[in-house]
A protein has these predicted regions:
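Noncatalytic, beta-rich nucleic-acid-contacting surfaces in large DNA/RNA-processing enzymes
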Residues: 1-422
Length: 422
């Protein structure tokens, strides 16, 4: 170690004040350090769980405190590629070959007719439930206000939803009042620069105005007068002044391409779509077999219970998202097979005889460790009783065994192997 005098110790200690002790999971921000430096030239570091032997080091300093000196990359995890890969594996379809102008797929953003139901009282007029970017009640409302029929309109809507003060109190009002069309409103950063250049303004000035607006700084000095002289309408100038943050168009295009491919599977390969979606939800604790596999009436009752509960928790709201998709799954004529000790996978939703077979982790409270233990314990075995299953799977608790029994996973297996002679 290094020796330091009291003054240096006090200086270093001051720099550590306010640092978090617990690390938890980081979403994947990577701080890039120049080759001739080390991270501790800029800030202290931590080892996860205070384990000095760990290869991973993290820092919990607010990034803006060092953004003038260091580059940070946000390498965030994404669910959509996982879902697409699963659907590719189940169907043999390469997602990159999916046409982005498929009419049936495009239609679900305005109508659910192609899915076999219309104007549902729970899901509304569109078929966009479970489609990334467009699956919340807020974005489905946005679809109804704009009725998109082209891919580029979906890109604009993605910009609306990811921006701050871009849709509500801004573009939405302009569209509903017919002051502007969807295509003429500001959705992404690039829209401003391209539009101003088309009005005859200088490219560099158009870029500077776009940069100021997208960061929420309003219009630069003199810009409003220049825009008026170029023939930019008052409503457009007013819209620029309201914006606090604008999404980049390339980012929106990437998101919408992914969403459209997933929507294509929903229309043309529904069972693989739902199997992949439910898997994704179950990985986050958002799928509960007890609430979701008991038929459409049971699902409607659970949706109503959460909707009518003013004190619904964040977990309830998360379950509601899945319940809506399960409701649609039933509405389209599909159903679940009962969880089976012999056939269910530990974590994946399987397609069996035209039905979806939930995994063991779909049972609330049964974790992956116990689920894999069940898969391992059943290999090459035919059980005579539930007691034998418990003996073969030591990581599965009595509580879990009861949950499996309640879910019908054991079929007609008796509790014990003992035979009564009388």
């Amino acid at each position: 170690g290094k020796t330091a005098n009291r003054a240096e110790e006090a200086r270093l200690a001051t720099g550590c004040v306010g640092v978090r002790r617990t690390t938890g999971q980081h979403p994947g921000g990577l701080v890039v350090i120049p080759q001739e430096n080390e991270i501790w030239d800029f800030c202290p570091v931590q080892h996860p769980a205070d384990d000095p032997n760990s290869d991973q080091i993290t820092t919990h300093f607010e990034y803006h405190s060092m953004e003038e000196n260091l580059l940070k990359l946000d390498m965030l995890g994404h669910d959509d590629p996982t879902m697409i890969r699963m659907m590719e594996d189940m169907t043999g379809v390469d997602a990159k070959t999916i046409p982005l102008d498929d009419k049936d797929t495009m239609s679900i953003f305005t109508s659910s007719k192609v899915l076999g139901y219309e104007d549902d009282p729970i899901l509304g007029p569109t078929g966009a439930v479970a489609i990334p970017e467009f699956n919340t009640r807020f974005t489905r409302g946005m679809l109804m206000d704009t009725m998109p029929t082209r891919f580029d309109t979906l890109v604009r809507l993605s910009g609306f939803s990811h921006g701050t003060d871009v849709w509500l109190g801004n573009a939405k009002d302009l569209i509903i009042s017919k002051t502007a069309t969807v295509d003429s409103t500001i959705g992404c950063r690039d829209d401003i620069m391209i539009y101003l250049i088309s009005c005859g303004m200088l490219e560099k000035r158009s870029f500077k105005i776009m940069e100021a607006v997208r960061k929420g700084r309003g219009l630069p000095d003199g810009a409003e007068e220049e825009m008026v002289q170029a023939g930019v309408p008052d409503w457009y100038i007013g819209s620029c002044k309201k914006i606090k943050y604008l999404f980049p168009k390339a980012h929106a295009v990437a998101y919408v391409m992914m969403a459209f491919r997933i929507a294509w599977f929903k229309v043309h390969h529904p069972l693989p779509f739902y199997a992949a979606y439910f898997y994704r939800r179950s990985q986050k604790g958002g799928f509960d077999a007890a609430l979701m596999t008991g038929g459409i009436d049971n699902v409607i009752a659970n949706i109503d219970a959460i909707d009518n509960n003013e004190d619904a928790s964040a977990k309830d709201e998360d379950l509601l998202t899945t319940l809506e998709v399960v409701y649609e799954f039933y509405l389209r004529g599909f159903s679940f097979a009962p969880i089976s000790i012999y056939d269910s996978h530990a974590i994946k939703f399987l397609i069996k005889d035209g039905k979806i077979l939930p995994p063991f982790v779909a049972i609330s409270g049964l974790g992956e460790s116990a689920a894999w233990d069940l898969m391992e314990g059943r290999k090459g075995k035919t059980f005579l009783s539930i007691e034998e299953v418990a003996a073969a799977c030591p990581k599965v608790s009595k509580t879990h065994m009861q949950m499996l029994k309640d879910a019908g996973a054991f079929g007609s297996l008796p509790d014990t192997s003992q035979i009564s002679l009388f």
